[in-house]
């Protein structure tokens, strides 16, 4: 991936001083190279992205790894717009990166997959850059100060855990910002009215770092004092009606309100047009709303894991629409095998969709289950034949299958007799009834009407409205 990446949790860092040999110092469990000769450049990103498919311990399609399993199933709304990733040995042996990305809009599936592939590389790059700068600054300061005063200053700076939190926090912020900037300037991907959520976690030893935008969610399954499983929500669903989110959007002249036929779903609208109706306050892409309060700044949190913590579940809102946190934890904990936990959870969500909302179209579902003890089942019951045929029909994560690129429709709900009218290109590989829409959180059955995360109607910037 460029630079010096340790293959051990006890990695070291090198620095040159007056032509002497490199002095190696352990620092925060992740190795880096502070020599100017080994400084990473943007070209390293290109090389990294080109070699993604050959990286070991990185999975992006329904499968399992040493300590995790992932599964996705296409809903009844067109091409699967969900993407997911588990990357073990991420920079070092004790680091694991996981993420779920739920796309929305005409090209949401392409945005979600672009973020899935690029964001981890950017996160790695910014962490190593920040770590190198901090180590160089630390080395200069120690040479200038006496030994006693240097030690005292190091104590004042705080523990390694605090430093680690600060580094990862800044790396998450910078990588999310850089990811959104790359989407804005992408020559072949129209993100004006398309975007993606992003719930990501990074586990390093007992430290858990989380960066989240949108309404995908991460939860923690733990044992209480009675050895009963309990659920803890790790991230906040960043909806437009949250006070701090609504305040920011309104301050930027955006509007937040719900439609009459779905009063429980607040949406973000342009100042002078009832478009695009985004059902979240933060997202990658969606540049038509970036000047009106929608941001790509992640909510970053840190948690120290304990021996009672058993597993972490990341999922798109297709799961959370029909299952509670407690139900998800119970389903994963009671799965016949760890390798099949993600698939079992998606199948349970699919059944709930049919029972609770028989007239509604099921949303895409994507699940990542990370088991914190690092163990999986010895038997392999997660073969390819167990996967949904719908999943296989749309997955092209590794570039082995081509899909109809930029072929996703979107639905504009304008009147009762045009509820399912579609605009854009038609995907010939799906049934005509499969409108290309994406569901959002807490969906109520609406007599078969599909609810979408973004009511993508091209904005009409009329002068008459701007004057009123």
Swiss-Prot record:
Query: Know the name of this protein?
Result: Probable protein phosphatase 2C 52
Any one GO MF annotation of this record: phosphoprotein phosphatase activity
Chain positions recorded as Mn(2+) 1 binding sites: 102-103
Cofactors named for this entry: Mg(2+); Mn(2+)
Q: Which CDD domains match?
A: PP2Cc (cd00143)
An example Pfam family from this entry, by short name, is: PP2C
Q: What is any one GO biological process for this UniProt entry? A: protein dephosphorylation
* Similarity comment text for this entry: Belongs to the PP2C family.
What GO CC annotations are associated with the protein?
plasma membrane
Fetch the SMART domains from UniProt.
PP2Cc
Highest taxon in the source lineage: Eukaryota
InterPro entries the record matches: PP2C (IPR015655), PPM-type-like_dom_sf (IPR036457), PPM-type_phosphatase-like_dom (IPR001932)
| Lineage per the UniProt record | Eukaryota, Viridiplantae, Streptophyta, Embryophyta, Tracheophyta
Q: Which residues bind Mn(2+) 2?
A: 102, 317, 363
Name the source organism.
Arabidopsis thaliana (Mouse-ear cress)
| Entries under PANTHER family matching the protein | PROTEIN PHOSPHATASE
Q: Where is this region: Disordered?
A: 413-442
Per the record, where are the segments of Polar residues compositional bias? 413-429
Residues covered by the PPM-type phosphatase domain: 67-372
Q: Recite the UniProt cofactor note for this protein.
A: Binds 2 magnesium or manganese ions per subunit.
Task: State which Enzyme Commission number(s) the record gives.
Answer: 3.1.3.16
Reaction(s) the record says it catalyses = O-phospho-L-seryl-[protein] + H2O = L-seryl-[protein] + phosphate; O-phospho-L-threonyl-[protein] + H2O = L-threonyl-[protein] + phosphate
